[in-house]
Amino acid sequence: MPKQKTHRASAKRFKRTGSGGLKRFRAFTSHRFHGKTKKQRRHLRKAGMVHAGDFKRIKAMVTGL
C-alpha cells in the first residue's frame, strides 16, 4: 500500500502543540474590520484549538506534523 501524503494546504493552516493538540488560526481576519468591535478584533488575534470532532480527520490529513 502506498504511503499517505500530507495535505499541504492543511499542513500550512494547523500546527501541533506540545501536548499533542492541533492549533488553528481564526477566520474573519483578512478585511472589513470596520464592522467589527474592538473586542471582536482582539479575540480574533488569538489562535484556537481544533475541536475533538474534527481532530481525527485533520490529524489524518497532516500526517507529517
UniProtKB/Swiss-Prot annotation:
GO terms for biological process: translation. InterPro entries: Ribosomal_bL35, Ribosomal_bL35-like, Ribosomal_bL35_CS, Ribosomal_bL35_sf. GO terms for molecular function: structural constituent of ribosome. Keywords: Ribonucleoprotein, Ribosomal protein. Residues 1-16 have a biased composition (Basic residues). One of its GO terms (cellular component) is cytosolic large ribosomal subunit. Belongs to the bacterial ribosomal protein bL35 family. NCBIfam families: rpmI_bact. HAMAP family: Ribosomal_bL35 (MF_00514). This is Large ribosomal subunit protein bL35. It comes from Streptococcus equi subsp. zooepidemicus (strain MGCS10565).
